[in-house]
A protein has these predicted regions:
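Short C-terminal tail/terminal secondary-structure segment
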Residues: 186, 197-218
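Catalytic loop of short-chain dehydrogenase/reductase
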Residues: 87-123, 128-137
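A conserved structural motif in NAD(P)-dependent oxidoreductases
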Residues: 170-181
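Alpha-helical segment proximal to the catalytic Tyr-Lys
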Residues: 81, 133-134, 194
Length: 218
C-alpha cells in the first residue's frame, strides 16, 4: 500500500494498535513530526467476530467493541489538539468514521451472527453525531460512511458462501467497487464537503433500505 500511494506523492506508514494508548501516542507524535499537524483523521480500523449466540464469547464481543468503538473515541479525543490547530471556519479539519450498513439495520446473516459488529457500528454512528456537535465550535466536522458489501478480508467468508444472496438483496444487484468508497471519502475530505457535518452516509447500493431482505441459506 505504501508503494502504491507513494506514486501520488510523499507517503509514510506506521504500524500501530489503536486500542493501545502508547501506540496511539506514538502514532500522533509521528504525524506531528512528519506533517507538522493533522487536518484529516479517518477512523478505519475494524474487527469482527461471528458465532452463534450460545457460543459467542465475552472476550470476542469485547475485542470488537474495543476496536470498532472505544478506540475511535480514544484516538479522536487524543487527536483533537492537532486537528484544532489545523482547522479554520472556512476549511475545517475532518474526521471520517467508517461505519457500516449493519449499524443502520439489523443484519440477517443468520448462519454467522455478528452481534458485536453491528452493535459497535450502530454506536459508532451515534458517536459520530455526538462528536459533530461537540467539535463544531473548534471547526472540526465529523461524519461517518456506512458501507455495504465490498471485497475485503473481512467479507471473504460471506462472499464465498452468500455472494449471490448479497447481490440479490441489493437493488443494484452487485457489491461495491473500491472507487465508490474512494469517491465519498474524497468528497468529505475536500472543500466541497466542508459544510457536511454529523451525517451517516450509506454507500451500499440501497441495500439498507431494501424491502425484500430475507434470511440467507446455503
Amino acid at each position: 500500500a505504501l508503494a502504491e500511494l507513494s506514486e501520488f506523492g510523499e507517503c509514510w506508514a506506521l504500524a500501530a494498535d489503536v486500542t493501545n494508548s502508547e501506540d496511539r501516542a506514538r502514532l500522533l507524535q509521528f504525524v506531528e513530526e512528519k506533517l507538522g499537524g493533522l487536518s484529516i483523521l479517518i477512523n478505519n480500523a475494524g474487527a469482527n467476530w461471528g458465532a452463534k449466540l450460545e457460543e459467542y464469547p465475552d472476550d470476542g464481543f469485547a475485542k470488537v467493541i474495543n476496536t470498532n468503538l472505544t478506540a475511535v473515541f480514544s484516538l479522536t479525543r487524543d487527536a483533537v489538539p492537532l486537528l484544532s490547530e489545523s482547522a479554520t471556519a472556512e476549511d475545517p479539519s475532518r474526521i471520517i468514521n467508517i461505519g457500516s450498513m449493519d449499524g443502520i439495520h439489523v443484519p440477517i446473516v443468520q448462519r454467522v451472527p455478528t452481534f458485536a459488529y453491528s452493535s459497535s457500528k450502530a454506536a459508532l454512528h451515534h458517536l459520530t453525531r455526538s462528536f459533530a456537535v461537540e467539535l463544531a465550535a473548534r471547526h472540526i466536522t465529523v461524519n461517518a460512511i456506512a458501507p455495504g458489501f465490498f471485497e475485503s478480508k473481512m467479507t471473504d467468508y460471506v462472499f464465498e458462501h452468500y455472494k449471490k444472496d448479497i447481490e440479490d438483496d441489493c437493488p443494484l444487484h452487485r457489491v461495491g467497487r473500491p472507487e465508490e468508497m474512494v469517491g465519498i471519502v474524497t468528497y468529505l475530505a475536500s472543500r466541497a464537503g466542508a459544510y457536511t457535518n454529523g451525517t451517516v452516509i450509506p454507500v451500499d447500493g440501497g441495500t439498507s433500505i431494501s424491502k425484500g431482505r430475507r434470511p440467507w441459506t446455503e
